[in-house]
Amino acid sequence: MSQEKYIMAIDQGTTSSRAIIFNKKGEKVSSSQKEFTQIFPQAGWVEHNANEIWNSVQSVIAGAFIESGVKPNQIEAIGITNQRETTVVWDKKTGLPIYNAIVWQSRQTAPLAEQLKSQGYVEKFHEKTGLIIDAYFSATKVRWILDHVEGAQERAEKGELLFGTIDTWLVWKLTDGAAHVTDYSNAARTMLYNIKELKWDDEILEILNIPKAILPEVRSNSEIYGKTAPFHFYGGEVPISGMAGDQQAALFGQLAFEPGMVKNTYGTGSFIIMNTGEEMQLSENNLLTTIGYGINGKVYYALEGSIFIAGSAIQWLRDGLRMVENSPESEKYARDSHNNDEVYVVPAFTGLGAPYWNQNARGSVFGLTRGTSKEDFIKATLQSIAYQVRDIIDTMQVDTQTAIQVLKVDGGAAMNNFLMQFQADILGIDIARAKNLETTALGAAFLAGLSVGYWKDLDELKLLNETGELFEPSMNESRKEQLYKGWKKAVKATQVFAEVDD
């Protein structure tokens, strides 16, 4: 094989780790994937073993090399993208985590989030971080670990512990402890970072009593953070030079560089992000304001709507209810359903995300009759994903006073043609599916490649763009609104059921 150069992207997700090697055309040369254990210590809690995540990353790096025959010295740079908010605290000396990683989905810190709300901090946190106070973000997770591991607070104050989201943990491991860094997009999801002033917020750190010594340095999304320790990369000292949280990486991978462009990634959850340009814009309707990416000395902001359960609702049909053998089968069943659409599934298994932010809500089903079939139930579950996306797109249009013309989509569930057509119908706009669904990994690769000159600039990246399939709306207006009205009723009833008893 010639000494062609490549970029490797490490995509560390919620249920698996992947390594993908890309060539100059942005094409996938090889990939490797490994699932790891989901730990559920109590109802609503979700944890990961951070060492197992690291082992899975080492495994997929090897797998990507083996599959392609590419050698480590042919990798020009590494880009990292990761499940956001998931929190690791580890011992600086030994490199060992002091507790499991608390995952973004986990609700174990919900009481702490409620406490902060009741103390009147909602507005302050929103103005500084762009976020809603919720157990979803890293801040309460860090506080929980420092509270529940004996001696942790004292050790943190002495500078013996380090905190990081998964990007930080992986860079620290790959560089053998030489770099303790994060990037704008991941820092913006901690609820500890002031996205206006671009620094860790001293006042919030004080409120939560989190020592500054444990925090990583915040850097741009495209620069060299460090090099791989040779023994972690088969003898290669390769620059790690691009980093972004998974949803922001997908925004970049979808080449959504212009303000007003919107993408949705249908993964475990579903995340809709709109590029709002260089002006920070706070949502008045419960969307998150976050950092899209920072590159070439400029920071681009974004509005985001987070849906906690999307693809994982299909996994639930497969693993929990055993209604389907595999995820793609859900499309076949949905097409076989009676065409009445009167069943509504509200998959609030871990609460409701944007724009409701109800952490007490739980999953519910409405409209069942004696005639309801398995096919109807599966279809309603798929439709629930599309309804939740509409909740957010409608809110975004109100917040920005922008009419969204097209939604760029990617992620595993975007392969479901039934879901994509229903999404176009219920939104009444075109859905443009990326030809290369690896947009998250591709975004990380683009960020890494730009900083080492593998790709010259954003204009060169735009030339690599190939659109996949376009789904156009075909449902009439009154039917569309009637269906959506039913969904709103179902969500309202779900929230009533979740009300805390006196």
UniProtKB/Swiss-Prot annotation:
Q: Which GO terms describe its molecular function?
A: ATP binding; glycerol kinase activity
Q: Where does sn-glycerol 3-phosphate bind?
A: 14, 84-85, 136, 246
Q: Could you tell me the EC number(s) of this protein? A: 2.7.1.30
Task: Specify which residues bind glycerol according to the UniProt entry for this protein.
Answer: 84-85, 136, 246-247
Binding of ADP: at which residues? Answer: 14, 18, 268, 311, 412, 416
Q: Which PROSITE patterns match?
A: FGGY_KINASES_1, FGGY_KINASES_2
Q: Is ATP-binding tagged as a keyword?
A: yes
Q: Which residues form a coiled coil?
A: none
Q: What does this protein do?
A: Key enzyme in the regulation of glycerol uptake and metabolism. Catalyzes the phosphorylation of glycerol to yield sn-glycerol 3-phosphate.
Q: Which family does it belong to?
A: Belongs to the FGGY kinase family.
Subunit (UniProt)? Homotetramer and homodimer (in equilibrium).
Q: What is this protein called?
A: Glycerol kinase
Name its species: Streptococcus pneumoniae serotype 4 (strain ATCC BAA-334 / TIGR4)
